[in-house]
């Protein structure tokens, strides 16, 4: 299974037209992905047959949330589930880097009440012990976990990924992501035994109104912003 990490309505339509079957829908990919717009989800579900898993993440940085942030996370999950989301992508950690078991169990139960998929995101890669964390997620009833093996890229984390899959691959679906592309996907799948991959296939688009002689809204070099590179998508779909 290939899941594409998508940050816009336009990119969702384009990857669907290329033959993609599943996406993780976000906004603000430059921040690691935040909750998407409800209107984007509704249009995608109306106009494509994509399986759409929606991120619920209210802010940048880490995953130790206040009670106010948790209220918003659950409110957003409800809105997405009521409007066609096939799964919810979330992550709750305690201050010490362990899984926030209570919030995770509550979210899994809520998602499963809609008979949808509960997916723990790369907050997993910030946990203090990946094997203990995986056991906790299994005990909480999580269906799938996205991970790079606690390294910046899956290639760097391949030994951890292999170990996790050998120990837990029959109990929870492991989705391998971060830096996975057409050039390394086959090798990584063979080495780790993980057959499910997650990729953003990022490219850069230019917006000439980003910068003037006096004002700049640039956050990348020049006037660019993240968008999917469709050639990379095609290559990965052909692996």
Set out the residue ranges of the language-model regions.
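Hydrophobic faces of well-ordered beta-strands that scaffold small-molecule active sites
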Residues: 2-6, 23-25, 52-56, 88-90, ...
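Catalytic cores of alpha/beta
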Residues: 7-14, 64-76, 125-140, 164, ...
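Active-site-adjacent beta->alpha loops and helix N-cap segments on the catalytic face
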Residues: 10, 29-48, 68, 94-111, ...
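Glycine-enriched alpha-helix->loop->beta-strand junction motifs that scaffold or abut catalytic
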Residues: 18-23, 48-50, 84-87, 113-115, ...
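Glycine-rich phosphate-binding active-site loops on the catalytic face of alpha/beta enzymes
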Residues: 24-34, 79, 83-95, 142-155, ...
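Glycine/small-residue-rich loop that forms an oxyanion/phosphate-binding "nest" at active or ligand-binding sites
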Residues: 39-44, 50-104
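Histidine/lysine/aspartate-rich catalytic loop segments that bind and position anionic ligands
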Residues: 115-155
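C-terminal alpha-helical cap/extension of soluble enzyme domains
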Residues: 168-239
